[in-house]
């Protein structure tokens, strides 16, 4: 009777290898999860501005519709320019009239200046005559005692000296009057500068009546139409700056140690989760509103915790700038998923 051969014992090496590989994979997954934070608590966002007119007036042209994309320099709306055109025409007419008045006044001033120069020459002549009369009197008076001149000669010298002084005072008054008349054109020149400033301001207001897009963007919250009276500094609609899109991703505070500015990120939007976008961390938030009713600071974002009956890690917003965003997919508030590369 033949005996059956015994089966060789199976090696345990393959099983141990599988277990080892599983442990390595588990360690890798744990490391990956710990060093490469990920969150689905994220949303797309972009900077916005309120489009406000800087002058008041009735809207006569509205060149955009709600949710329309615009390019930098595109016409948004136009305010009735007629009041500002009228103000400009009035100011320019005032300037023309003032220039004519200045021209006529300048002619008069030139004549007055000529008269003033003549009076100044007369003043010098009168001053010389008064000096001569005074010198003559000073020489004549001592001669009376010596008998070389008569008292009548001395009286005539005194009369001549007084007359010369009177003539000098008279021409000095004429010179002062002529000088004051010459300075009268300065006020008109100063008034012209004020009118020119008014013209410049009116031209600026007329330019502001036409409002154009300051950058590439998209119009939202448009709730007005042609004929509406627009008040200066009151918003007409909002304009999204579509040149730069970013994602606000709320990460647990325990993940922040692995996040820093410049960390590469992968972004997916809920509207099309099969498409990914690359980005980089721009900044990490340093303040959120607490849930326990503690100190509240205006302007801080509020990030709700997922469970409020268990002490869980707070979440802080991380701003991720998106490279080459799809303008048709990105919308403010769109749900997103953010995955950061391990650091």
Swiss-Prot record:
Coiled coil: none annotated. Residues 1-12 are cytoplasmic. InterPro entries: CusB-like_dom_1 (IPR043602), CusB_D23 (IPR032317), MFP_Efflux_Pump (IPR050393), MFP_proteobact (IPR005694). GO terms for biological process: response to antibiotic; sulfathiazole transmembrane transport; transmembrane transport; xenobiotic detoxification by transmembrane export across the plasma membrane. Could be part of a tripartite efflux system composed of MdtN, MdtO and MdtP. Belongs to the membrane fusion protein (MFP) (TC 8.A.1) family. This is Multidrug resistance protein MdtN.
């Amino acid at each position: 009777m033949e005996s059956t051969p015994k089966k060789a014992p199976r090696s345990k090496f393959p099983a141990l290898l599988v277990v080892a590989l599983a442990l390595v994979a588990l360690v890798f997954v744990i490391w990956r999860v710990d060093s490469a934070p990920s969150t689905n608590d994220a949303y797309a966002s972009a900077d916005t501005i309120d489009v406000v007119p800087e002058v008041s007036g009735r809207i006569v042209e509205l060149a955009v519709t709600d949710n329309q994309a615009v390019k930098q320099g595109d016409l948004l709306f136009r305010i009735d320019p007629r009041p500002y055109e009228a103000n400009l025409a009035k100011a320019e007419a005032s300037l023309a009239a003032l220039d004519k008045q200045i021209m006529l006044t300048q002619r008069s001033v030139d004549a007055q200046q000529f008269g003033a120069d003549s009076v100044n020459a007369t003043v010098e002549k009168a001053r010389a005559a008064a000096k001569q009369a005074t010198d003559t009197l000073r020489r004549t008076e001592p001669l009376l005692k010596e008998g070389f001149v008569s008292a009548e000669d001395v009286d005539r010298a005194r009369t001549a000296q007084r007359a010369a002084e009177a003539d000098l005072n008279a021409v000095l008054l004429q010179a002062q009057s002529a000088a004051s008349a010459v300075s009268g054109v300065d006020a008109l020149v100063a008034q012209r500068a004020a009118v020119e400033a008014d013209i410049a301001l009116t031209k600026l207001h007329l330019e502001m009546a036409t409002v154009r897009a300051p950058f590439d963007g998209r119009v939202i919250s448009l709730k007005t139409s042609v004929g509406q009276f627009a008040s200066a500094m009151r918003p007409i609609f909002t304009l999204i700056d579509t040149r730069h899109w970013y994602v606000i991703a709320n990460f647990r505070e325990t993940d922040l140690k692995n996040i820093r500015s410049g960390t590469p990120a992968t972004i997916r939007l809920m509207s099309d989760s099969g498409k990914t976008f690359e980005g980089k961390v721009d900044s990490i938030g340093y303040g959120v509103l607490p849930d326990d009713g503690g100190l509240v600071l205006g302007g801080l974002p509020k990030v709700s915790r997922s469970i409020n009956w268990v002490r869980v890690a707070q979440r802080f917003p991380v701003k991720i700038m998106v490279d080459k965003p799809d303008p048709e997919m990105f919308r403010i508030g769109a749900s997103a998923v953010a995955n950061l590369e391990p650091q």
